Amino acid sequence: MAVYTEVPDEELEAFLATYDIGTLMSYKGIAEGVENSNFMLHTDAGTYFLTLYEKRVAESELPFFLGLMNHLVDRGISCPTPIRNRKGEMLGRLAERPAAIVSFLEGISVRRPQPRHCVELGRALAQLHMAGADFKLARKNALNVDGWGPLFDSCRDGIDAYQPGLAQELDKELAVLTREWPRDLPHGVIHADLFPDNVFFIGDRLSGLIDFYFACNDAFAYDLAICLNAWCFEADGSFNITKARALLQAYTQVRPLEPAEIHALPLLARGSAMRFLLTRLYDLINHPPGAFVKPKDPKEYLTRLRFHRGVASPAGYGLDA
């Protein structure tokens, strides 16, 4: 979450007057993340989050994101609840941008996840996948395997400038992924961005999931692969199979994986690593000088991609095929 748009006090007060959330006492911008402008609001009725959606989030897709959060809350998933204004609308406008207010979620993210955190994550991810089964709206994954080639082509020259020879390596990897990608796995609504900073804990217990603005319809096992990459590597680049086993076993206790999903896991993990490697490369190559948010380092996802390329079977993640 980041602050890109400053909001004049009088505009904010007029906007909040259309909601029944009490009188504003104080607010502050939140300088994290890369997508939207976010503010924490303190009113005499409680604490809330205000989000102004910047240009990377299409306004036409906001009903999906907000509707999904509302649906998941109704199904017992702990995530921010969109607050409706007095007209019953979840989406408004502020500072010439689409804007929404959501409930405040208690908890903090963990910087160094342990196996016990991965157990909590696996269980919550499976519950999310099952809870989204009857959600009526759908959103295509714009960053699926079919989108990686165009993304790569758009920054190929910059990739070789970043690391000579890397473009050729990624070109070959993309050919393999495109040819072998499984397209008939069980699918539905996935989070698609469940990094540790998007998962809150109180003590060792998971207290909620946030940041659903990459959520889409895709394979459930691909969402698992994203979590393998985001949660199961150490700072030195090594893979922690204990964390992976904890994550996967906890998931399967809630939603058992089909044999095809288990078999596809190494390829899905490669694809997940490729997706985040490419977006990080793109953001680094196209990073404006003096921009507020520092781009994330692509190298860690290159290391992860190369690791998964060497995984011969699901046993490499602690699963039996």
Curated annotation (Swiss-Prot):
The keyword Cytoplasm does not apply. Keywords: Amino-acid biosynthesis, ATP-binding, Kinase, Nucleotide-binding, Threonine biosynthesis, Transferase. It comes from the Bacteria. The keyword ATP-binding applies. Its EC number is 2.7.1.39. Pathway: Amino-acid biosynthesis; L-threonine biosynthesis; L-threonine from L-aspartate: step 4/5. It catalyses: L-homoserine + ATP = O-phospho-L-homoserine + ADP + H(+). One of its GO terms (biological process) is threonine biosynthetic process. Disulfide bonds: none annotated. GO terms for molecular function: ATP binding; homoserine kinase activity. Belongs to the pseudomonas-type ThrB family. NCBIfam families: PRK05231.1 (NF003558), thrB_alt (TIGR00938). This is Homoserine kinase. It comes from Parvibaculum lavamentivorans (strain DS-1 / DSM 13023 / NCIMB 13966). The gene is thrB.
